[in-house]
Amino acid sequence: ALPERATRRLTLDVLAGSEWTLVAWDAGEPTPDDPAITLAFRDGRVGGSAGCNRYFASPQPGPSPGELAIGPVGTTRMACPDALAGSESRYLQQLQAVRRFGFLLGRLALSYQHGDGAIGTMLFEERATPP
C-alpha cells in the first residue's frame, strides 16, 4: 500500500507541518552530515537551517499539481566557516531555483533548474516529530 501522502494530489497542503533533512544533492551526491540542512513547512512559510544560518521564505504553488516556487529567501547573517558557507550558498541558490516537488521512495524531491537550463533534484528525508 502507498503511504497516504503519495496518494493525495500534489499541493502544498501535503507538506503542511512537515520537517525534512537534506540527504542528497544532484545524482545522489551526499550532503554534509553535521550540521544538517533542514527544511520545514509551517504556517504557509518554509524555513530551517542552511547549515550555518537560519533561513525563511514563502512557497508559491504553480498552476499545475507539483509545481512550486520558493523565495525570495531571507537568512540570518552569522559568520560561517568556509566549508559551511559553500554548501549553504549552494543550498540557498538551489532552493530559490525550485520548480517542482514530488516524492521518491518516501523522500521529498525538490527539482530545480540550474543556470544552464539543466534540471537537478535535491532529496530530503522526513524528520521524526517529537511526541
Regions found by a protein language model. Name each.
Residues A1-P131:
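Lipid interaction determinants
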